[in-house]
């Protein structure tokens, strides 16, 4: 394999890796405030992408994306309010099954609205054949959009959690729910907010990658499982590590195509997930001691 | 005669030395109590002895064989049963069924035999149920046999848990704060029950906070403080030990 | 024990009554879907004992079904006559390979369904053993994701492998002669017999599992579900028990996969999809989790309705909604035996309250 081809694989890996990282961050936001793994996380991405594609017919692209993100955010809020908020001390098994049920429901609704067709947003700049030459590598401008927007989102999110009152309240809930409640923070609202945030971020991710990866009613589950792989790889709850782990998985997957038939691409990432779960469930960067203390 | 011998057992959690070089012997047929203020490492010590935690160092010899490093179920199979500080009854099972789980080690039907309901599993099941009812009789809970265990009063739940451990027919019984959360009457009843269990030729090692219970029934008391053994003697001597009085009264932990 | 015999006899009567009803109303063709429901019920029963009783969730059971079904289908359709060689002729002499005519009058040399079935179930059991060890160390979300991951791997492999027909699956799978005169086959002339064969398997499985539940092993599994550490302290080797029940459960799914594949005359990748696994889980949930009879009746009803197309294009959505509603409002399941136990328990407590 020559260097140019190598870099080409790396670029492809980074593109996919970014979206996995975004899904993983969505997992982390909800996990941190609730201890729940939201199995419907991939559906947020799908919903965002699908809604934006539909809206793009009548609205200019940026407006379509904005509205799609808002719509998905509202869906996230509704899900939390209707299905999660009023449960008292739900068991982990119960939460898993509920979010799986939600994932199926969202997917089936999407199937009835949009059908089985595969859709995509137009490229943000240029077309599918436009490319920028960087060294020996041809990069689609969309890749730059994906990486750029994702980097901005991660930065804003970091700032939000670190510097704003709301963000700090969410972190307080994550650290100690009861103590946060004693300080007058509404833990329930924080949970709703975390669902909204994670839905919105997922939807934005779905919009920006859809020109490259396409989107269809059933693209949620593979995204969810890969996002989960990445979240585990980075250590559940650790968003910064997730971004890095996303790249790692994306690149691994991209190179796997050069060895194995493309049809087995998903097999690779899921196999990686299983290996990590078996060997080091605390993630590459997490400590085993901490992972054991988490409630499972 | 020593049944259980704990030698230089230590365990660290991060920066805290939870159990620090603790050694003592549990004589056969006696009631030995481990006491100490909150956070002294009593429960950790229990987990180390019963295999739920691995010590960093040390040795635990039970009936002449090293049991350190064995899985909890292997240690149980050697004749050590235990209860938990917070009752760990099996929900959705009746009182009798909870006790019957304790007979697991005294029956041997495997998956295939049980699926086929072979004649020997039938005989075994009858024997298991008989033994279970005998335990309920001993506890005075025969009337509650078919009630859901977790719906009993708290005091009765503790008795069921004790009965479940007793059903294992252990050589040594580890009781983790058997009187925790019980009122005075229930505590006294628990004390009588523990004494009656000793009469069944079961050696008892217990961790306890309630001094009255410990002083009444124990033959030997081990005192832990900050993970270290600071005293070991008969109850009357422990009551007069200035060091013990200091940690219990001086620091206001009791 | 007598109660259990009555329950089984009652259920057998229901099975016979359904057949009679289809006969009298001239709806004999409904037996086809009812037969398929029976095989899916085997998977559900296996999952019920694993998830409901032993408390170990699996969102990958369609994977075991597919391993059984696909392997049996592959072995009984793959033509070995082209391979020649001493091994092939040796196997043919032992009766493991058998000649049969194909659709066009030619001759095929394929594995006889019996050895194929045994091999297929054995393979599923071996896979369950291999992955069960590490998978069942996990709990909660991790366990759910790992089993889901296993299901996805199986699905992607069958979908991406030409040897097993990729998206088309394997078809022209021959009938499975269980005993002389009894064959698992989709032929309409054998419809009634196959209906009874299928439900016979279910009843057999039900007897096995009911025996298991009422035994010391059943109690040990329930205790693992209730409080794993306390179960360990009672001397129950929890890891080994979890692995064994996982394997039993996988074997049920694999047997169902083999039999349904021979009944349908083929298998496609959708049988291994995540949605199938979720569907089995939904049925166990609505049946009351730790309730074999509840799971069985729900499986009979829901699979039948689904296979008859009553849910139309909302098929998957129906199961998703069921899952959510059950978990939100009746997470102990609808058909709960515990409800009766609770009432009885309350009465007994009131009676026992007079004791000093």
Please place each PLM-identified region on the residue numbering.
Chain C
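Transmembrane alpha-helices and adjacent helix-loop boundaries
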Residues: 1-356
């Amino acid at each position: 394999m020559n260097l140019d081809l190598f870099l080409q694989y790396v670029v492809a890996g980074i593109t996919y890796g970014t979206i996995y990282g975004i899904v993983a961050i969505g997992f982390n936001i909800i996990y941190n405030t609730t201890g729940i793994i939201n199995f419907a996380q991939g559906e947020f991405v799908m919903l965002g992408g699908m809604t934006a594609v539909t809206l793009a017919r009548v609205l200019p692209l940026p407006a379509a994306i904005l509205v799609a993100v808002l719509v998905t955010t509202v869906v996230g809020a509704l899900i939390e309010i209707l299905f999660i908020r009023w449960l008292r001390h739900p068991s982990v098994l119960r939460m898993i099954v509920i979010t799986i049920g939600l994932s199926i429901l969202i997917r089936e609704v999407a199937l009835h609205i949009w059908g089985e067709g595969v859709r995509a947003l137009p490229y943000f700049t240029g077309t599918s054949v436009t490319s920028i030459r960087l060294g020996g590598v041809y990069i689609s401008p969309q890749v730059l959009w994906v990486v750029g927007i994702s980097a901005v989102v991660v930065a804003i999110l970091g700032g939000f959690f670190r510097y704003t009152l709301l963000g700090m309240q969410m972190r307080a809930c994550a650290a100690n729910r009861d103590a946060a409640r004693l300080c007058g923070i509404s833990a329930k609202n924080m949970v709703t907010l975390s669902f909204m945030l994670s839905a919105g971020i997922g939807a934005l991710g779905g919009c920006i990658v859809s020109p490259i990866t396409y989107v269809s009613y059933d693209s949620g589950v593979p995204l969810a499982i890969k996002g989960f792989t990445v979240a585990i790889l980075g250590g559940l709850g650790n968003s910064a590590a997730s971004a890095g782990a996303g790249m790692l998985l994306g690149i691994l997957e991209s190179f796997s195509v050069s060895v194995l038939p493309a049809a087995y691409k998903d097999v690779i990432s899921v196999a990686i997930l299983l290996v990590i779960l078996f060997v080091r469930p605390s993630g590459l960067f997490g400590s085993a001691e901490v992972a054991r203390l988490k409630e499972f | 005669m020593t049944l259980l011998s704990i030698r230089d057992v230590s365990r660290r959690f991060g920066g805290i030395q939870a159990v620090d070089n603790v050694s003592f012997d549990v004589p056969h047929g006696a009631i030995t109590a481990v006491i100490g203020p909150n956070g002294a490492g009593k429960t950790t010590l229990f987990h180390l002895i019963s295999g739920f935690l691995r010590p960093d160092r040390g040795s635990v010899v039970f009936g002449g064989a090293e049991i350190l490093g064995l899985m909890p179920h292997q240690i149980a199979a050697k004749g050590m049963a235990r209860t938990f500080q917070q009752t760990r009854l099996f929900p959705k099972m009746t009182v009798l069924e909870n006790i019957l789980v304790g007979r697991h080690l005294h029956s041997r039907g495997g998956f295939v035999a049980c699926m086929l309901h072979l004649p020997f599993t039938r005989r075994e099941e009858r024997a298991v149920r008989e033994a279970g009812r005998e335990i309920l009789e001993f506890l005075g809970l025969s009337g509650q046999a078919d009630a859901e265990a977790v719906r009993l009063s708290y005091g009765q739940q503790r008795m069921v848990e004790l009965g479940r451990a007793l059903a294992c027919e252990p050589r040594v019984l580890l009781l983790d704060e058997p009187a925790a959360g019980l009122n005075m009457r229930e505590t006294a009843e628990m004390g009588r029950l523990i004494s009656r269990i000793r009469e069944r030729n079961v050696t008892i090692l217990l961790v306890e906070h309630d001094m009255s219970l410990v002083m009444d029934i124990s033959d030997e008391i081990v005192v832990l403080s900050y993970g270290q053994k600071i005293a070991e003697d008969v109850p009357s001597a422990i009551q007069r030990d200035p060091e013990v009085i200091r940690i219990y009264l001086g620091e206001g932990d009791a | 024990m007598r109660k259990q015999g009555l329950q089984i006899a009652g259920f057998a009567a229901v099975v016979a009554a359904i057949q009679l009803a289809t006969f009298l109303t001239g709806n004999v063709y409904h037996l086809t879907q009812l037969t398929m429901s029976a095989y899916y019920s085997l998977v559900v029963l296996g999952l019920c004992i694993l998830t409901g009783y032993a408390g170990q969730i699996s969102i990958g059971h369609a994977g075991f079904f597919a391993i059984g079904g696909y392997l049996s289908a592959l072995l009984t359709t793959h033509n070995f006559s082209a391979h020649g060689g001493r091994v092939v002729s040796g196997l043919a002499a032992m009766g493991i390979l058998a000649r049969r005519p194909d659709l066009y009058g030619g001759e095929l040399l394929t594995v006889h369904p019996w050895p194929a079935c045994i091999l297929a179930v054995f393979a599923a059991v071996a896979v369950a053993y291999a992955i069960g060890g590490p998978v069942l160390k996990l709990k909660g979300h991790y366990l759910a994701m790992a089993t889901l991951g296993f299901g996805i791997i199986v699905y992607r492999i069958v979908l991406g492998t030409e040897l097993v027909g990729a998206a088309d699956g394997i078809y022209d799978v021959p009938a499975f002669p269980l005993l002389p005169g009894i064959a698992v086959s989709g032929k309409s002339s054998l419809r009634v017999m196959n209906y009874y064969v299928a439900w016979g398997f279910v009843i057999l499985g039900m007897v096995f599992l009911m025996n298991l539940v009422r035994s010391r092993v059943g109690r040990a599994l329930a205790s693992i579900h209730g409080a794993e550490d306390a179960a360990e302290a009672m001397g129950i080797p929890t890891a080994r028990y979890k692995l064994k029940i996982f394997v039993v459960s996988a074997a049920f799914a694999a047997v169902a996969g083999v039999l349904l594949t021979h009944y349908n005359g083929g298998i496609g990748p959708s049988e291994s999809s995540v949605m199938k696994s979720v569907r089995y889980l939904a049925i166990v949930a609505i049946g009351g989790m730790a309730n074999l009879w509840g799971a069985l009746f729900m499986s009979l009803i829901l699979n039948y309705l689904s296979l008859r197309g009553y849910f139309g294009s909302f098929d998957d959505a129906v199961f998703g909604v069921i899952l959510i509603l059950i978990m939100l409002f009746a997470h102990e399941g609808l058909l709960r035996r515990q409800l009766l136990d609770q009432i009885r328990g309350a009465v007994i407590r009131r009676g026992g309250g007079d004791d000093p």
